[in-house]
Amino acid sequence: MAASSSEISEMKGVEESPEVPGEGPGHSEAETGPPQVLAGVPDQPEALQPGPDTTAALVDSGPKAELAPETTETPAGASETAQATDLSLSPGGESKANCSPEDLCQETVSKPEVSKETTADQGSRLESAAPPEPAPEPAPQPDPQPDSQPTPKPALQPELPTQEDPTPEILSESVGEKQENGAVVPLQAGDGEEGPAPEPHSPPSKKSPPANGAPPRVLQQLVEEDRMGRAHSGHPGSPRGSLSRHPSSQLAGPGVEGGEGTQKPRDYIILAILSCFCPMWPVNIVAFAYAVMSRNSLQQGDVDGAQRLGRVAKLLSIVALVGGVLIIIASCVINLGVYK
C-alpha cells in the first residue's frame, strides 16, 4: 500500500510537472493544447474528491499510521499545486470561475437596473404622453360654460331696454337745449314722448326770396298799398305808401329783370328839375332828391321802392311848380298894382 501511495504521488507529480513548468519552457504545450487547460479547470473537483477517498482507503487498509498523514498531505499539496497551475495557465479562467457568481450577481443587478431604467423611460414617455390626456378633461368644461352663458342672457335682455329708455329723454333734453339756444320755445317734458317735436323752422317757400330779404307778408301789404294808392292818387287825402325799398316782381317793367308786360316806373326827375326854377325852394329841392333816389332804386332792381319814390318826387315837384307859379303871379299883381 505504501508503494501504491508513493506511485500515486509520483504519478500526480508527473502530471503536475508538465503543468507547472507551463510558465517557462513548456508554455508551448499549454498554448498548443488549450483543451488540456480547459480540461484542467473542470478537473479541480475531481482532484479534490480523491483526497478524502484516499484518506479513507488508507486509514481502513494501511496498518501504518504514518503513511496516512503523508497521503493526506499529498492530496492537499496536489490540490494546491493544481490550483497554482490553474492560476498560472488561466488567470482569466480563475477570475471567470471565481467571479462567475459575482458576474451573475452583477448581471442580475444590472438587469433590474436596466429594467428600472426601461421602466423609468417608459414612465417618462407615459408622462410625456400623459399631458395631452388632461386636454380632453377641460373639453367637458366648455359644456357648462354655454349652459351658464344663456342664463345671464335673459337677464341682460330686459336690461337693454332700461338702458335704451334714457336715450329718448337725453335726445329730447338735447333738442330742447338746442331749441333754447336757437331762440325756439322748447317743448314740455311729456310732449316729446306723446308726439313728434315741431319743426323749429317753417319749410322754405317755393318762391324766390326778394333781393333785400323782405318776407312775403310785407310784400303783399306793399302791393295792396300800391293798388290803394293808384285808386286814390287823384285825391289829396289818399293814403301814401311807405318810402321803404322793398322789392316786388309783380310791378317790374319791361326793361327791368322780371318785368313781363308791366310799365317801367318813372322817376319824374325832369319835373323835379323844372320845379327847381320855381320860388318854392325847399319843396322843389326835396322833390329832386326823391327823383334821384327813385332812379337809384330802379337800377338796383327795387321796382316797388322806385315807383314809390317816383310818386313822392312827382307830388313834390307838382306842388313846387304850382306854388312857384302862384307866387310869381302874386308878385306880378302886387308890383303892377302898386305902380298904377
Curated annotation (Swiss-Prot):
What does the UniProt function comment say about this protein? As a component of the outer core of AMPAR complex, may be involved in synaptic transmission in the central nervous system. In hippocampal neurons, in presynaptic terminals, plays an important role in the final steps of neurotransmitter release, possibly by regulating Ca(2+)-sensing. In the cerebellum, may inhibit SNARE complex formation and down-regulate short-term facilitation.
| Name this polypeptide is given | Proline-rich transmembrane protein 2
Entry's Gene Ontology BP terms = negative regulation of short-term synaptic potentiation; negative regulation of SNARE complex assembly; synaptic vesicle fusion to presynaptic active zone membrane
Instruction: List the keywords (alphabetical).
Output: Cell membrane, Cell projection, Cytoplasmic vesicle, Membrane, Methylation, Phosphoprotein, Postsynaptic cell membrane, Synapse, Transmembrane, Transmembrane helix
PANTHER family, per this entry? NG5, PROLINE-RICH TRANSMEMBRANE PROTEIN 2
- UniProt source species: Pongo abelii (Sumatran orangutan)
**Per the record's keyword annotation, is Transport included, yes or no?**
no
The membrane spanning regions, by residue number, are 318-338
